[in-house]
UniProtKB/Swiss-Prot annotation:
Segments of this protein annotated with the region Disordered: 1-148, 593-640
Region of interest (Required for interaction with NOP7), residue spans: 312-429
Keyword Nucleus (UniProt): yes
Taxonomic source organism: Lodderomyces elongisporus (strain ATCC 11503 / CBS 2605 / JCM 1781 / NBRC 1676 / NRRL YB-4239) (Yeast)
Cellular compartments annotated: Nucleus, Nucleolus; Nucleus, Nucleoplasm
Keyword Nucleus carried by entry: yes
Cellular component annotations (GO), alphabetically ordered: nucleoplasm; PeBoW complex; preribosome, large subunit precursor
Gene from which this protein is expressed: ERB1
WD repeats: from-to residues: 481-520, 529-569, 658-700, 703-741, 744-783, 787-827, 843-874
Single biological process term from Gene Ontology: maturation of 5.8S rRNA from tricistronic rRNA transcript (SSU-rRNA, 5.8S rRNA, LSU-rRNA)
Name recorded for this polypeptide: Ribosome biogenesis protein ERB1
Gene3D superfamilies: YVTN repeat-like/Quinoprotein amine dehydrogenase (2.130.10.10)
Length: 874
């Protein structure tokens, strides 16, 4: 009965019934699922989805559920619209519904069009039904539901599932163009989900937050909803918040949300652990048991248990060769078999008597073999009971002990014993044997063939000394008065006054002809300063100034002795005092002259302007010019010019230059405005160039290699000669370059001197040598003279017109030579020894310390360690 009533309904009401049945079915399914979840306790990870399932989908769209609901609503609305159109209804949208002004008109239209059969009460009667009727009614509803599903969804099948597999909850539909569309179920956030505790995140991307300053919102969340700007409190609220800081307050503002940025308890705990250097991850155990990967026990692995190579099982060719050699030696008899060795041993035991030297013969020495020289036989003084004349007295023993071991005639003292058994062991036997072994090892023997040459023919033909006069031959005057060693002396340009400096700290000036002392200045007080003494002094080459430069310790004193006339003394003092004004007001112009400038002076004018700018930084001689706009800093760094006090002015001192280290040598430029000083212990400031007219002192070198021993100016060229311990360098002051490097080939140079013509140089060394360098030839010496027995202290050319030079040594002897330099460059200089002058005493192995030639005469002045100065004349 129920089936007939359902089938008898009008076709126009079928869609409406289907929609109603679909809604009822959906509500029933939802209610059933809710009850099932309560009963069975469905886990939070399961999803309850109604829709189509596409197992092949991989997408993960979070808005799939919302899209599904919207699609179902659109389908329902479309069904309702189609149903209304079938009934003749004209309403299609929300705007059309506004045309009905009242409910009466709407009800009237519905009453006219609706069929009473649509609202039939069949199946909903309150009367009791039989069991068969109830079953028929249920079958009718089931058929209606099936029909509704077929009509509403067509080919799409609806499945209601409650499963845990997310891939089976996907909905598979199509877009308007027919392409497949996959809708995944919405994720239900639970406690373990990543998004369960996440706040609304601003998804504006790379758009700056400043773009939302004039808008009430600050961006959009993941669902496209606006994130409203948080309300800002008043100034009072902000003050209260700053006073009562909430938990996790940082004072920072989140740019994405506009809300204050807070730190959680977990983040605070993490920060605390980092500050306390604790373990930040509780799951990590810092004290895990040690796993010793590398042990002493060898592990059997492919690296050590490799298969044996084939070559170990193949006979070796090299072993075969060695075996063949052994076989050959056995056949030749060089190797005996055990049987033959036993037989030979038995024969030897039978022959007991044999000649030890039977098969030996004298082997002649090799032709190049040189036997060691035999020791000299002992003399009478080496006897244990020598004659009385060989024994030394107390005075001779004391003299023998004071001598240097190298200078002793014998290395033992003869002693007398009554019997041979009383002679003790010789304590120097091991040392003498060791020294002899060193001599044989370090001094190889050489076989020399004797030449049958007349020795007289080897001596060059030299002119007679009588033909080379004048030269000094005798001591005419002795200048006595100093109590210490006279280390230096100098003669004034006119040749009238001799200045000497001694270890007693005094400078004395003597009259040359009479030997009378005319002036004395005590520059060093030996009671307060016993280490300093007069090291060097030299007169200014300008005879009109009368200036004497004295080096005492670290100071350089410029004196004008009151022995000249008023005019000369006044000129010298004014020359020194003019520099004080320059030092006060500074330099206002460049010292370097511009190339191409019209200069009226000779080459020396440029030299004087450019000497103080010479700089050499390496052996290649590439110098760098120092700036001269302001030379005061350089002067203050290397030396300091000091105005003397009243007591020093009374001694004739006009200026004092204070250096860093002890000044050993001083040399004037021929113009008299510049002078160079040498301080060997001052390293890079060992060489200083001082300018008298400007009171300037500067170091021309940034660094120096080796210890500087002496420095001289060229007689007329803008060149500077600097001598270190082993080499001599020549610098061009105009071009700021290194011109030449001389290699004397000695260990320790003492001093140098230049020939007045400037093309030859003399050098003296502490290893008893005098070297003559020709600057036009090679860097090695032209002549090396070895005639002194001890260190050569000084060597000097005659600065006048006489071809003389002399050398002084610690042996107390002065050698005078004739040295002629020819104008022809193809002719070698002529060197002739003239005279040996001896008169100074040797004190503590120190003899003559300094010599100087008279500027005009062939006179020689010398200073010795005996405290005297001597004049040697013709």
């Amino acid at each position: 009965m129920a089936k007939k009533e359902v089938s008898a309904s009008k076709p126009g009401n079928t869609k409406k019934d289907n929609v109603l049945l679909k809604k009822r079915k959906q509500q029933a399914v939802e209610k059933e699922e809710a009850e099932k979840e309560k009963e069975e306790g469905v886990s939070e990870d399961e999803f309850n989805v109604q829709g189509l399932i596409d197992p092949e989908s991989d997408s993960d769209d979070e808005g799939a559920a919302a899209a599904e609901e919207e699609e179902e609503e659109e389908e329902q609305q479309q069904d309702v619209k189609e149903l209304d159109l079938d009934k003749g209804e004209v309403i299609s949208s929300d705007s059309d519904a506004e045309d009905f002004d009242s409910e009466e008109e709407l009800n009237k239209l519905l009453g006219e069009e609706d069929d009473p059969s649509d609202y039939s009460s069949v199946g909903f009667s309150d009367e009791p039904k039989e069991d068969g009727d109830e079953q028929d009614e249920q079958d009718a509803f089931a058929a209606a539901d099936a029909a509704t599903d077929d009509d509403a969804f067509g080919d799409v099948k609806l499945k209601n599932l409650s499963i845990t597999d997310p891939s089976k909850l996907e909905v598979r539909t199509k877009f308007s163009d027919g392409t497949p569309r996959i809708i995944k179920p919405e994720i239900e956030p639970v406690y373990d989900s990543d998004d369960s505790d996440a706040e609304n995140f601003n998804t504006i991307g790379n758009i700056p937050i400043s773009a939302y300053e004039e808008m009430p919102h600050i961006g959009y969340d993941i669902n496209g909803k606006r994130i409203m700007r948080p309300a800002k409190g008043s100034a009072l609220d902000q003050l209260l918040e700053s006073i009562d800081l909430p938990q996790g307050w940082t004072g920072l503002l989140d740019q994405n949300t506009g809300a204050p940025l807070k730190i959680t308890d977990e983040e605070l705990e993490l920060i605390r652990k980092i500050q306390q250097q604790e373990n930040t991850d509780e799951n990590i155990n810092p004290y895990e048991p040690l796993n010793d990967w590398f042990t002493k026990n060898q592990e059997v692995m492919p690296l050590t248990a490799v298969p044996e190579p084939k070559r170990r099982f193949v006979p070796s060719k090299h072993e075969a060769k060695r075996v063949m050699k052994i076989v050959k030696a056995i056949r030749e008899g060089r190797i005996l078999t055990p049987e033959k060795a036993k037989e030979l041993k038995e024969k030897e035991t039978e022959e007991m008597n044999y000649d030890l030297w039977q098969n030996e013969s004298e082997v002649p020495d090799h032709i190049m073999n040189l036997r060691a020289p035999k020791l000299p036989p002992p003399t009478n003084e080496e006897s244990y009971n020598p004659p009385e004349e060989y024994l030394l007295n107390e005075e001779e023993k004391q003299k023998w002990l004071e001598q240097d071991p190298v200078d002793r005639e014998r290395n033992f003292i003869p002693q007398k014993y009554s019997s041979l058994r009383l002679v003790p062991g010789y304590q120097d036997s091991v040392r003498e044997r060791f020294e002899r072994s060193l001599d044989l090892y370090l001094a190889p023997r050489l076989r020399k063939n004797k030449l049958n040459i007349d020795p007289e023919s080897l001596i060059p033909e030299l002119p007679s000394p009588k033909d080379l006069r004048p030269f000094p031959i005798k001591c005419s005057t002795v200048y006595e008065g100093h109590t210490g060693k006279i280390r230096t002396l100098s003669i004034d340009p006119q040749g009238l006054w001799l200045a000497t400096g001694s270890d007693d700290g005094s400078v004395r000036i003597w009259e040359v002809l009479t030997g009378r002392q005319v002036f004395k200045a005590q520059l060093v007080n030996k009671e307060h300063n016993g280490e300093d003494h007069i090291e060097s002094l030299e007169w200014n080459p300008n005879a009109q100034t009368g200036i004497l430069a004295v080096c005492a310790g670290e100071n350089i004193y410029l004196l004008v002795p009151p022995i000249f006339g008023f005019e000369i003394e006044n000129t010298g003092k004014l020359r020194i005092e003019s520099g004080w004004g320059y030092d006060t007001f500074g330099n206002t112009k460049q010292d370097l002259k511009v190339k191409g400038e019209d200069t009226k002076g000779d080459l020396d004018d440029d030299e004087e302007e450019e000497e103080e700018e010479e700089d050499d930084d390496d052996d290649e001689g590439q110098g760098k010019v120092k700036a001269h706009n302001s030379t005061a800093p350089a002067k203050k760094d290397v030396a300091k010019w000091i105005n003397p006090n009243s007591s020093q002015q009374a001694m004739g001192i006009s200026a004092i230059i204070q250096c860093r280290r002890t000044v050993k040598k001083i040399s004037w430029h021929r113009k008299g405005d510049y002078f160079v000083t040498v301080s060997p212990d001052s390293k890079n400031t060992a060489v200083l160039i001082h300018q008298l007219s400007k009171h300037l002192s500067q170091s021309p070198f940034r660094k120096s290699k080796g210890v500087i021993m002496d420095a001289k100016f060229h007689p007329f060229k803008p060149q500077l000669f600097v001598a270190s311990q082993r080499q001599i360098k020549i610098y061009d002051l105009a071009q700021q370059t290194l011109l030449k490097k001389l290699l004397p080939g000695v260990r320790l140079l003492s001093t140098i001197d230049l020939h007045p013509r400037g093309d030859n140089l003399l050098a003296a060394s502490y290893d008893k040598r005098v070297l003559w360098h020709d600057l036009d030839l090679a860097a090695t010496p032209y002549k090396t003279l070895r005639y002194h027995e001890k260190a050569v202290r000084q060597i000097k050319y005659h600065k006048g017109s006489l071809p003389l030079f002399a050398s002084a040594s610690d042996d107390g002897i002065i050698h005078v030579f004739h040295g002629t330099v020819y104008d022809d460059l193809m002719t070698n200089p002529l060197l002739v020894p003239l005279k040996k002058l001896s008169g100074h005493k040797v004190i503590n192995q120190i003899g003559v310390l300094d010599i100087v030639w008279h500027p005009k005469e062939a006179w020689l002045f010398s200073a010795g360690a005996d405290g005297t100065a001597r004049l040697w004349t013709t």
